[in-house]
Amino acid sequence: MRASQFLFATLKETPSDADIVSSQLMLRAGLIRKLASGLYVWLPMGLKVLQKVEKIVREEMQNIGGQEVLMPMTQPAELWQESGRFEDYGPELLRFTDRHNRDFVLGPTHEEVITDLARGELRSYKQLPVTFFQIQGKFRDEIRPRFGIMRAREFTMKDAYSFHVDQASLEVTYQQMYDAYTRIFQRLGLNFRAVLADTGSIGGSASHEFHVLAGSGEDAIAFSDGSDYAANVELAEAICTDERAAPTQDKQNVSTPKIQTNEELAKFLDIPLHTTVKTLVVKGHRINEDGSEGDEQLVALVVRGDHTLNEIKAEKIAEVATPLTFATEEEMKAAGLKKGFIGVDLDMPVYVDRAAAALSDFVSGANEYDMHTTGMNWERDATITDVVDIRNVVEGDASPDGKGTLSIKRGIEVGHIFQLGDKYSKALNCTVMGEDGKPVTLMMGCYGIGVSRIIAAAIEQNHDDNGIIWAKTPDIKDSIAPFDIAIVPMKSKEDTVMQTAEALYEELKARGLNVILDDRNERPGVKFADLELIGIPHRIVVSDRNLAEDKYEYVDRRDGEKQLLSREELLAKVSL
């Protein structure tokens, strides 16, 4: 490709509404342009990157037997009503009515459509297992689109769906998909982690997320320094190895005027923060003998003062209402509770986190305004309904697998795989004839990759003050840089420079390398700045002075090192 025939849409200034580095650099490098809130045009430079990511994803899906399909973005609302998600999904699901007064949705995901396809096309267990995938646009009506294409309303996604006669078959494909995702991110040269995850609105049982590690990531992930254990902080089990010591203090109420937080309390009493507890009161219900939900009641959740409540874990307590809802001020007053000073000796179920349950001589609220109680001890002064894991893990916690300690880092979710089970196949009556001649409800797996999101995540992980640095890949042909090599001929009165640049350009193309000849009528400084901004990994400068010595100036974008190389050395360098 010749630069004079290609759209270089670089910007000198950063758009004011670009809120993170990847968005700023993608706009400045001319990869994308904003059309409206959460909607972006992919320019030629950016589309080349997008298509390269799609190619790697497509190859790995096909390598494990995935069959590519293409489903419409517009979906009949009746399918979503049949699955039960039409109302559950919320306002992110864009609903509309066509001219014939029929209801439709703009697809944020395709579980319903693929299940409808499967129930119409799959007849026998002999056709299974089978995996279908597509790479296609999705639409989610985000309330606050932000971070460029990271959280856009319209985005490109690879979604795959597998169908099975039993759980054992699903687990085999799930592992194959896990391995394929691992290969995809390895081929892309990204620093990533696969972590245990929550199934969310998709539903199902087992689930893993794939995160690109970056300081700007929205998610916190915990991983061990002594094993391959990794999990989303929301799901990581919090281990407590401490044993409760015998009491050494008597309980005593102390005045704590205007103290609002545990941090203020610890400072006021000159004690370690971890020797305090906080009590959070949520809505709940009694559990009847038959296991059904009974009358409404309030439930107390107690964690250490230096820990935070994990709402996902708390929702797993049978007596806690879902979604987790904190008691209102009126409800607490009716129960005789003093907001900000709630203790642990309460006339309601009291669920205590493991770490808080290991405390002795701790400080809690006194159930009186401007008062706390020191020297509190479990069993002697307050009763525990049950000891549970209801907190987020923190840096330095013991790893749940017993190997090493946990580190916490930020991550950008770029992939998510689920074992759906029969949630959708049962709702949509998707069955095949089993080996025994009887109908079998299919088991399903669901596997998504944010194709466009990968690009933003890669830039968040790899950039400098001059622009994008595309990650070095094990195979140069897997590089997702729009061009891998740029040849810059310097202006000269002689034809030799351009002729040499043209010859080198043709040779590199013949070797199957992705090269651009920057023949634009621009100053060298402008060309160099553009190429650094876009992140072209290899830059070759052809000039009179260096050709006199049969040399080429080579610059590696990743380290900025300049070298004078012979033709043979140059060809060896850019072919790595």
From Swiss-Prot:
Share the domain note from the entry. Answer: Consists of three domains: the N-terminal catalytic domain, the editing domain and the C-terminal anticodon-binding domain.
Q: Which UniProt keywords apply?
A: Aminoacyl-tRNA synthetase, ATP-binding, Cytoplasm, Ligase, Nucleotide-binding, Protein biosynthesis
Which one GO biological process term can you cite for this protein? prolyl-tRNA aminoacylation
Task: Tell me how this protein assembles.
Answer: Homodimer.
Enzyme Commission designation: 6.1.1.15
Q: Which GO terms describe its molecular function?
A: aminoacyl-tRNA deacylase activity; ATP binding; proline-tRNA ligase activity
Instruction: Please list the reactions this protein catalyses.
Output: tRNA(Pro) + L-proline + ATP = L-prolyl-tRNA(Pro) + AMP + diphosphate
Q: Which NCBIfam families match?
A: PRK09194.1, proS_fam_II
One Pfam annotation reads: HGTP_anticodon
Q: What is this protein called?
A: Proline--tRNA ligase
State the function annotated in the UniProt record. Answer: Catalyzes the attachment of proline to tRNA(Pro) in a two-step reaction: proline is first activated by ATP to form Pro-AMP and then transferred to the acceptor end of tRNA(Pro). As ProRS can inadvertently accommodate and process non-cognate amino acids such as alanine and cysteine, to avoid such errors it has two additional distinct editing activities against alanine. One activity is designated as 'pretransfer' editing and involves the tRNA(Pro)-independent hydrolysis of activated Ala-AMP.
Keyword Aminoacyl-tRNA synthetase part of the UniProt annotation: yes
Q: Which CDD domains match?
A: ProRS-INS (cd04334), ProRS_anticodon_short (cd00861), ProRS_core_prok (cd00779)
Q: GO terms for CC?
A: cytosol
Cross-referenced InterPro entries: aa-tRNA-synt_IIb, aa-tRNA-synth_II, aa-tRNA-synth_II/BPL/LPL, Anticodon-bd, Anticodon-bd_dom_sf, Pro-tRNA-ligase_IIa, Pro-tRNA-synth_IIa_bac-type, Pro-tRNA-Synthase_IIa_type1
Q: Where in the cell is it found?
A: Cytoplasm
What family is this protein classified in?
A: Belongs to the class-II aminoacyl-tRNA synthetase family. ProS type 1 subfamily.
Q: What class of enzyme is it?
A: ligase
Q: Which PROSITE patterns match?
A: AA_TRNA_LIGASE_II (PS50862)
Q: Is the keyword Nucleotide-binding in the record?
A: yes
The organism of origin for this protein: Psychrobacter sp. (strain PRwf-1)
